[in-house]
């Protein structure tokens, strides 16, 4: 039996009545966003819109982005990444569970000093995936060049995020490279391992 999105009571400011809203709407009021699935265009558009709204509402307060994601679409992930860098608000990234592939990239994209993970989080980095079906050789060649260009761009960005050399990032991401929360901190992908909400910002 599938579990639906939980609802919680919420009282609008100035109202004496509570109404039931879904948990993600309620968390959004507190500037808490959640990436808890594979990264795709739909979730990217939703997160981009929410970050832009929260930033325009009050860019002096941080936005909290909780991540428990196996990764997903590179182009969708880059839309989220660019928005994290675009908004004036600090973006606190918090790994709960797994941040793999594009999930790990977004974890590292948070505001420096405000990228954290819970103690039993797992982080995995690797090169972007690309596949071809039955297509013309010239199309396959074009796609391969684009994948290599994206790989190079992601590795340079990861190098900037972590302080690791481009060559080390290139070597480590050649295959799946798993890190514990503490290892991710030592690697420079996050800044702290936390066990209490007060440690997040």
UniProtKB/Swiss-Prot annotation:
Top-rank EC class of the record's enzyme: hydrolase
Domain of life assignment: Bacteria
Entry's family note: Belongs to the peptidase S14 family.
HAMAP family with a match to the protein in the record: ClpP
Subcellular location: Cytoplasm
Listed EC numbers: 3.4.21.92
Active site: 101, 126
Function: Cleaves peptides in various proteins in a process that requires ATP hydrolysis. Has a chymotrypsin-like activity. Plays a major role in the degradation of misfolded proteins.
Name of the featured protein: ATP-dependent Clp protease proteolytic subunit 2
Database matches in InterPro entries: ClpP, ClpP/crotonase-like_dom_sf, ClpP/TepA, ClpP_His_AS, ClpP_Ser_AS
GO BP annotations listed: protein quality control for misfolded or incompletely synthesized proteins
Record note on quaternary structure: Fourteen ClpP subunits assemble into 2 heptameric rings which stack back to back to give a disk-like structure with a central cavity, resembling the structure of eukaryotic proteasomes.
SUPFAM superfamilies associated with the record: ClpP/crotonase (SSF52096)
Key words, A-Z: Cytoplasm, Hydrolase, Protease, Serine protease
PROSITE patterns: CLP_PROTEASE_HIS, CLP_PROTEASE_SER
GO cellular component: cytoplasm; endopeptidase Clp complex
GO-annotated molecular function: ATP-dependent peptidase activity; ATPase binding; serine-type endopeptidase activity
Swiss-Prot/TrEMBL catalytic activity: Hydrolysis of proteins to small peptides in the presence of ATP and magnesium. alpha-casein is the usual test substrate. In the absence of ATP, only oligopeptides shorter than five residues are hydrolyzed (such as succinyl-Leu-Tyr-|-NHMec, and Leu-Tyr-Leu-|-Tyr-Trp, in which cleavage of the -Tyr-|-Leu- and -Tyr-|-Trp bonds also occurs)
């Amino acid at each position: 039996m599938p579990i639906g999105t939980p609802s919680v009571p919420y009282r609008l400011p100035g109202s004496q009545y509570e109404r039931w809203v879904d948990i993600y709407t309620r968390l959004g009021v507190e500037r808490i966003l959640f990436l808890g699935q594979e990264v795709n265009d739909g979730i990217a558009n939703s997160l981009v819109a929410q970050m832009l709204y929260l930033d325009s509402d009050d860019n002096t307060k941080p936005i909290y982005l909780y991540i428990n994601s196996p990764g997903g679409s590179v182009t969708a992930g880059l839309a989220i990444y660019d928005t994290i860098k675009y908004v004036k608000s600090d973006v606190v990234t918090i790994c709960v569970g797994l941040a793999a592939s594009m999930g790990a990239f977004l974890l590292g994209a948070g505001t420096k000093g405000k990228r954290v993970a819970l103690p039993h989080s797992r982080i995995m980095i690797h090169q972007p995936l690309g596949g071809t079906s039955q297509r013309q050789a010239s199309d396959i060649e074009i796609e391969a060049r684009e994948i290599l260009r994206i790989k190079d761009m992601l590795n340079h960005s990861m190098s900037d995020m972590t302080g690791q050399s481009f060559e080390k990032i290139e070597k480590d991401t050649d295959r799946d490279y798993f890190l514990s929360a503490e290892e991710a901190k030592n690697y420079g992908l996050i800044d702290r391992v936390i066990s209490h909400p007060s440690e997040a910002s």
